[in-house]
Amino acid sequence: MEIKSDHSEHGFQFPGTFELSVVGTAGKALETELPRLLALCGVELVQERISWKHSSTGKYVSVRIGFRALDREQYDAAHQVLRDHPEVKWTL
């Protein structure tokens, strides 16, 4: 069964520019490691949309990464490569 929207503006549109947020353990260089992993999986990074912020306790770091994906498979692969990192607690 295939589900389609009557409105093409609904949902993800590919190719497109997206942003993923990741929370992980601070002090593990996730600020540089996660963008590197995304680049290796074949997505184009949007350098000006890469940022990070440490938690108030300094225990965690939140990393936001902008990237371009050509299709849903590439988007899903980007999400998966981040989830697979052992220091990543969650992705959004």
Curated annotation (Swiss-Prot):
* Chain coiled-coil ranges: none
- Family matches, as InterPro entries: UPF0250_YbeD-like, YbeD-like_sf
* One of the Pfam families matching this protein, by short name: DUF493
Q: Which family does it belong to?
A: Belongs to the UPF0250 family.
This chain belongs to the protein called UPF0250 protein PD_0532
Query: What species does this protein belong to?
Result: Xylella fastidiosa (strain Temecula1 / ATCC 700964)
